Amino acid sequence: MKLTCVLVVLLLVLPFGDLITTSNTEDNKRGATPWQNSLKARGVCSTPEGSCVHNGCICQNAPCCHPSGCNWVNVCPGFLWDKN
């Protein structure tokens, strides 16, 4: 039970981790954190031609999953381990 709670908390918090260290100002737009870059480097995430890939990709550049760019939680649909 404790492990399940920890995993749920991690899944809820991880997409927002860069909010703690990155300010949302016009001069400093949201970018990918190092762990997000490493996910992209390993090929887990991809957004070819700006299309949404159902694999839990963290949005770095618009468009991604939503016509205006990242969706409200800054994450594409799916899970990080879903490689479809």
From Swiss-Prot:
A family per Pfam: Conotoxin
GO cellular component, one term: extracellular region
Domain notes: The cysteine framework is XII (C-C-C-C-CC-C-C).
Cleaved signal peptide residues: 1-19
Organism, scientific name: Californiconus californicus
Modified residues (6'-bromotryptophan): 72, 81
MF (Gene Ontology): ion channel inhibitor activity; toxin activity
Keyword terms of this UniProt record: Bromination, Disulfide bond, Hydroxylation, Ion channel impairing toxin, Neurotoxin, Secreted, Signal, Toxin
Entry function: Mu-conotoxins block voltage-gated sodium channels. This toxin reversibly blocks voltage-gated sodium channel in cephalopods, with no alteration in the voltage dependence of sodium conductance or on the kinetics of inactivation.
Disulfide bonds: 45-57, 52-65, 59-70, 64-76
Tissues with expression: Expressed by the venom duct.
Modified sites of kind 4-hydroxyproline: 77
Residues excised as propeptide: 20-42
Compartment(s) of residence: Secreted
Entry's family note: Belongs to the conotoxin O1 superfamily.
Protein's UniProt name: Mu-conotoxin-like Cal 12.2b
Main location as per UniProt: secreted
